[in-house]
């Protein structure tokens, strides 16, 4: 069932659905078959699993082979590619604002949802993760801040090259813009250096400050009704409405719904 090995220098586990690699000390990245990502963060006393992927059989057992520490499970948002395997865990942390998505994506979950608050700190022993609410992609999207090490684990809050803001229920573009501005401030103040995104296999690297600043520019245009240069957006796996569009600058792109854009000012 499981294959635990050292493949190359970094891989510590691999099967048909997931590959687990050491990202940095006591931090592992889980790259799944459909290019989604989980992160396992270990402290001296406890560990945290950030997101649970789409489909990864016996995820709890895989995690248990890597760390024997008591585990907290956090989902950055309630989309099925990040909360698809919560069934393997008795308790899962989420933001209350994403409960609107539970009937659609997690109605069969038999465990207990615990609700994170802005500024809540998970103390793992010698390592802390702070919750920051960053709505936009979903109403309850959060990121986890490891300020001591300069790391942010962002789920889909800022995308992985492209961010989806057309997902229902849609938030105003200004909401995403405000989240990006807050992230920029954290990075400029030196609290965060690297943003580790929710679809790491597409990039194989962290997102820098320049990426967030580009997202700020694009979202500022859209929230003021400027769609010049936008194009229709389609996705091979998920059917998009005819109103789905994309606006890109460099390596950053916002996917949005044209009905959610105000008239140009």
What does each model-found stretch correspond to?
Residues 1-5:
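Sec-dependent N-terminal signal peptides
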Residues 8-10, 181-265:
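Accessory terminal helices/loops
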Residues 11-18, 22-24, 90-139, 147-149, ...:
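Metallo-beta-lactamase
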Residues 14-65, 144-156:
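Conserved beta-strand hairpin/beta-sheet module of binuclear metal-dependent hydrolase folds
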Residues 37, 55-58, 78-85, 100-101, ...:
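Active-site environment of divalent metal-dependent phosphoester hydrolases
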Residues 50-53, 70-81, 93-95, 133-136, ...:
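Active-site neighborhood of phospho(di)ester-bond hydrolases with catalytic His/Asp-centered motifs
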Residues 55-124, 128, 160, 217-224:
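Active-site HxH/HxHxD metal-binding segment of metal-dependent hydrolases
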